[in-house]
Amino acid sequence: MERKPFETEQANVVQSLGISALPFYGLARGFLSGKYRPGVSVESVRAESVKEYQTDKGWKVLEALDHIAKAHGASLSSVALGWLRSNAAVSTPIASARTVEQLKEIMQVVVLTQEEVASLNAASL
């Protein structure tokens, strides 16, 4: 969700050096898992730091993720990680899990179409 610094400055450097990036907050501190929604209170140690994503842009991204996840029969987390993997400058997105269920969600592999990637990119700008 914090794409501008990477895409406007760092991605070109990474690619010119022939290396790749490892995004640390691949699920935007859990926001892209879909558990944070308007009007929903979430008990989490990350809840306060996730507030920065709870904006019109953030809700648009979740809406796009919802649509794509439904089409693939997949979790929002797996779609969000697939979105990161679609970026040529990213080798491996990093995501953490606290439960077995969360681990199962992030282990799903979702390959997105160009149209789906474009939809997510448009929502996040």
Each model region followed by its residue ranges:
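Beta/alpha (TIM)-barrel catalytic core signal, keyed to glycine-rich beta->alpha loops juxtaposed to Asp/Glu
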Residues: 1-125
